[in-house]
Amino acid sequence: MGVVWRATDQLLGRGVAVKELPLDETLSATDARRQRDRTLREARALAQLSHPHIIVVHDVVEDDERPYIVLELIDGPSLADRITDQGPVDAMEAARIGIDLLGALRAAHTAGVLHRDLKPANVLLENGTDRVVLTDFGIARVSGATTLTETGSFVGSPEYTAPERMSGARTGPEGDLWSLGALLCTALSGESPFRRDSLGGVLHAVVVDEIRPPAQAGPILPVVRGLLERDPDRRLDADRAERMLRAFRETGRTPESAPPGLLPPDREPPRRRAPAWREETGGRPP
């Protein structure tokens, strides 16, 4: 969704990242305008957010009607590059990354912003601090904003896209949580569990095939399985996922597989009511 350059803010004397939208001469005027508007939407979405694990937008400048987003410069690789160069991470590191991304997603969702493209390539790891930074809100959906995607088209990364969105349903924050589950699998094993040889194969894997998290996910398997629940109403929520990951980080023990409240209200076991005689006689049989 663009090319990112390392640059220098000459006025303030600081390093910045500049995201440029590649010029496509084949686009119609309408499509070119849509692409420009999408870039501006990304900047506006980021401008609403303030969180240590979300990239900071400094400015937007235009040159010959081409927008450039001036961003915080993160000196470090993407999670995708780190996996390629150094191999998968262990469960403790995956849990740390997951906790930080859950914080970022919670801040975005509270502000009415859905990322919709959470994947290893869009997560940066700062050198020296290992700070986790969520970036690239290019296809984010902002509450109250008009969608810029044409009817029937799809933008995003299928291997990390929730099944409800694949099927064309309108999605909420739960879609980003599914993406996080797939991302954790990739971080732990080096490959998405939904990778296939064709787009049709990926679609079938996400929507139909049995979901098989990698063996490396074992220590945090309940979290991964909860995030990769196909029914968004039953999917593990961000607060509980974070608590489970923090518990694992603190104790080293695998979190409980069925945390309280995971089931939606209509599926929770009914509470047993005391017999009428117990209420009327103070607990003594008549």
How should these model regions be labeled?
Residues P22-Q48:
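AlphaC helix of the eukaryotic protein kinase fold
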Residues V60:
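Activation-segment/catalytic-loop signature of the eukaryotic protein kinase fold
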Residues D64-S78, R82:
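Conserved short submotifs of the Hanks-type protein kinase catalytic core
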Residues L101-V113:
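Protein kinase catalytic-loop region centered on the HRD/HxD motif
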Residues I97-G98:
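Activation segment signature within eukaryotic-like protein kinase domains
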Residues D176:
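Conserved catalytic-loop aspartate of Hanks-type protein kinases
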Residues D24-A29, L124, A187, E191-P193, ...:
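Proline- and threonine-rich low-complexity intrinsically disordered cytosolic regions
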